[in-house]
Amino acid sequence: MSDQPLRHDADKGREPRLVPGRSGTRLFSMAALLERIEDAFREEYTPDQLRQADTSQARLKLILETTDYVLAVESVRLTPDEKADLVRRAYSQLFGYGPLDSLFLDERVTTISLNGAERAAVRYGHDELVDMPLLFEDDEHLRAVVERLLIDAGAELRDDLPAIETGLTIGGRPVSMSAILPSLAFGLNVDIRLHPRLAPTLDELVQNGFMTEVALKMLRPLLASKYGFVIAGETETGKTTLLNALAQELPQQDHVVAIERTGELRLPPQITPFTVRWPVNDRPGASFSDQIQAGLSAEPNCLLLDEVRSDEPEAIAPLLELDTPPRQIWVVRGAPDHKRLQSALGMLARRAAPGQGETLVHALYERLPFIVTVARIRGRLQLFSIAEWQSRIDTDYPDYVMLMRYEEGRAQPTGNTPARWLD
């Protein structure tokens, strides 16, 4: 959306709704009344009082008292529906996320895309993004809501951090968000992804059509084996969903560590998470690379990474250089095309430690010999393929051999067999 020109009717839908006050001598917009209520509320109640109001009922009572006060002072008469809407909006602004609250409550919403205050789009389920009516009064309103989201996620908007990716939980739903500041984009750009309250299991992924029983019968032995693998797919294709389901069935005797960017995974208690931390005030942050080092220091025998990115190749160098590395399961962003995937992974390994030639490329093939790809096809998330790097005697580079491949609406066996033994 960012490359589109501003609409000529950008203010359409923001026309103020006016109500009379002060015995008819003045007109107030609903937005102005809302602002007055917010200001009066902040002046009236101390942080200690707000902490004591720890239920929605207690908070609504305080907001209703403030609303009644402002309406009385300004001699404004509203209908019961108008007053209820004003109280709801004040609650959302003071204790929630403003116009995003209704979207967060909608279980169908999986993505919210914001390009400044002028454009908003929503994805329902796994369909395409659809444009929304204007959500924010102006850029300042958008920024205030984004700042509140970031604060609740343990981050903050900073001029020295033009791009932030973090996560939080809203209404029991894991939420990841990325924000790009105007220094890198036209206006404040925000993408928000929402996961379901209950993460699907592997069996439920079969039931909802993500994959077949045949595919699961190949994945479970792979999961129980000693071999590492990559889960690859483009944005919002089910990579984290699949990793989360797999993590629930990892052998419990394994010492497993998960390195996460946004904390989207719902991990069983025996898995230790290390999540990226952003600097806040004087508190230093911890990058993805930092957390990989911290995770390795815990001496796990299995390491989950969600997700490996091409713009941080140095982060994976220790994983490919260790003489006795842990088993590794990577989530990687990329198209489920074997030529492009092989090229991207090879380039990632070469850039991880320039000067080592093809050493780390071969290490990647050895430590991550299986590849599982996922895709969004006709509005549904699908397991696209399962493949293996299989050695050849006539070259140092392995073949990408498909074991399962998407055809006729589902991933099906190709007839090729794994070169490595899977129980």
Q: Can you annotate each of these PLM segments?
A:
Residues 239:
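Conserved lysine of the Walker
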Residues 245-365:
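Switch/coupling sub-region of P-loop NTPases
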Residues 236:
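Walker A (P-loop) phosphate-binding loop of P-loop NTPases
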Residues 380-423:
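NTP-binding/hydrolysis catalytic cores, primarily Walker-type P-loop NTPases
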Residues 231-233:
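Hydrophobic anchor at the beta1->P-loop junction of P-loop NTPases
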Residues 360-394:
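Phosphate-binding/switch region of NTP-binding enzymes
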Residues 115, 119-225:
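P-loop NTP-binding catalytic core
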Residues 1-157, 168:
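N-terminal accessory targeting/assembly segments
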